[in-house]
């Protein structure tokens, strides 16, 4: 046997077997590092460990199982709360907290208190907690199931079923209850994760903005109300849906759309004699308010006749309509909102108005609007009372069945009621009797002193009609003032109190303060000349306008600073009639020789209910004009909240009021000239021009009477 190869040497001098041994030493770790051999080696090592301890430490395995179950439940809670709390609309929660049941109010207040701390803060806290839980679960299951694909599959199944599907399905239906129950737990987590969650939530608020819930437009609200008719537990009826939808459209709807055209309106002239035929015609018309116009001017309305005034009138007296007190008949433009006109009707001043293209002029009337028209628009149906002849005035649909009292006998019935009541009062106690409106002996010639023809006795009563008349002095006929003007016993400016809690009467505004300046006439100065047809104002009248403009500017500043209504009046002499009374001009009266006076009156009042009321007297006829206020519903801030910016606003108001007064009195001069030029058209009536307007802090108004 030859040992030559073993003894052979390399060029370096080292034997070959040395290299072979070193090669095997360095390649052994690479072979055993393969996955198959490595796994079998680990498995063999565990078998060796299991052979000494059988199944292993059962206590630690049980602990891992319990931790896994807790993590699965926490993941489900976080996933459900994310949907339950974030899915709650803040507006819906506010509605439930005020109008829900007692239990719903408590739950909604808990959730609102949590969300009010920051909706993004709650969201980041829940998402961060859910991620931590889901990432920890596979690690714990690896200790229980031995790792590998078993832990991955098990954690996935548990998270999907018990951490997502079941919790979110429950919270979709019971999100409010579940969210309110876990509110304390979520609040603790929010503060535990404050260092991480709050900065992220602040960044989201800055980038995305805060979410305060879903707000609907009017069209969306109408759709929502309509859906409540067919869906939900408490379904709305058809009438409820109609009324709610009509209310939402009331502000955008114009009075021109619901008015009665002027050609379909029952009107009468002021010189109409109320005989048997005319009274029967009035009662057969079925109207309780009749617009009255000047003779030969069918579009120049001076007021409205309340039919109830004729309840004690004897048609044999044959008195003209101008003899009776007429209620104020305001005028408004066709573009006035129905909501604004409804607010005006609620003030108790009038329940009828004239729709005119040129409010305040002697022409331009296109229709009439009543409170009943607005209410009919609200309910979407026609209202037919006992005395109505037409079911629908616009379509001329007459009612098929008459009212409770036949129209054919109503005149004779009222006449019989009047005469029988008169006889009973004569036979009754003298303390309780009341005389008729006019003495029968003077029926054809009315007394020159109507107050002497009325009984001065009055009584106090409390009837079952809902009105408290204990503090009101009433009379069976309209009262007569010291100026001879007949006014109703229950004035709209001072309505009676109502005992019923469900009835509300809006009281008129307080009487404004008066700032009056007079221009005295000495004995040397000539009295004001009678009215002429000059087309220019005299120097004295222009000076009055200039002085009044300065006083008006000061009054505007006073009203803006104090918030109190103010009135400025400048006159050349004291007027005989009360400014609040309305005198109806009588035909045939000669006013050409009477001394004329000039009265300029400006009133400043806070605008209410979105309307500005003005009074214009054209050719002796006072007209009330109703117009919408500018941005009235966006400017309701109290005076006390504007103290900081008051100084700056007063400076700007000085400039604005000066310019507004200049333009205002310029227009008054022009209109005054135009009226003077056209006075020959009606020489038998009092020639006058008057303008009074109510303004808030945004403007002013003026009155001129000539």
Swiss-Prot record:
Q: Where is the composition biased (Polar residues)?
A: 472-495, 576-597, 681-706
Give all Phosphothreonine modified positions: 607
Enumerate the spans annotated as CBS domain. Answer: 259-320, 321-386
User: Which compartment or compartments is the protein found in?
Assistant: Vacuole membrane
Cytoplasmic side stretches: 38-65, 142-145, 199-706
- Which residues are on the Vacuolar side of the membrane? 1-16, 87-120, 167-177
Q: Which SUPFAM superfamilies match?
A: CBS-domain pair
Q: Where is this region: Disordered?
A: 421-495, 515-540, 557-597, 626-706
Residues found modified as Phosphoserine: 439, 447, 527, 603, 614
Q: Where Phosphotyrosine occurs, residue numbers?
A: 604
- One short Pfam family name for this protein? CNNM
Classification via InterPro entries = ACDP, CBS_dom, CBS_dom_sf, CNNM, Ion_transp-like_CBS
**Annotated ranges, domain CNNM transmembrane:** 57-240
One GO cellular component term noted in the UniProt record for this chain? fungal-type vacuole membrane
Function (record text): Involved in metal homeostasis and more specially in manganese sensitivity.
Tell me the protein's name.
Answer: Protein MAM3
Which organism encodes this protein? Saccharomyces cerevisiae (strain ATCC 204508 / S288c) (Baker's yeast)
Coding gene?
A: MAM3
